[in-house]
Structures are given as C-alpha cells and as structure tokens.
C-alpha cells in the first residue's frame, strides 16, 4: 500500500475523517480520536503508525520494518518504517481493528451521534 491507498481505505470506514496536524502528519480519526497517522513527508522514520492490541503490538514489533511508534508505543501503537513492511491483506484488517478499538472507547454519547 502507499499513502493514497491507506488514505482511501481509512476514509472508507464509517464516519472516519482526516486532519493535518503537527506540521506534516495526516491523522485519521473517528469521533475526533485518532486511530492512524501517516507522515506526509518521507524521511521521518515512520511512514504510518496505528493503534493495536497489546498482543498484536508485541507480535508486530518483532517484524523487520515495524517499530514501536514514537511517543505512542505505551498506548500500543506500532510504526511502519516503510509501506511494504506489511502486505495489504494484513495491513487493512489492522487499520480496521485500530478504527474499531478507538470507536469502542468513545463515550456512548459520541458513538450515538455517529449513527
């Protein structure tokens, strides 16, 4: 996947939106809470980071090209140093799971506004 296909997939998730923040980072959010972040400028080390379960975090950071996401690792976010670190068939379900994890943690009032 590349940044455009990641963007297209993330924005296809119900009520997901995007926001540029911190200079050149593209945040993908649900209910104003981020579930994935893409670097808009290459060369920053991590191209894509996203939330995952503690078990998946431990598994993924053992793979080449995947590291604990800077500043977010304590919340079980991983960072891809290159887009081909994970094939599309593996990355899409991980992004969808990140979205669902954040959605499930939103306050009930916010979740109800999204329906």
Language model segments and positions:
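Charge-dense, helix-prone N-terminal extensions
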Residues: 1-115
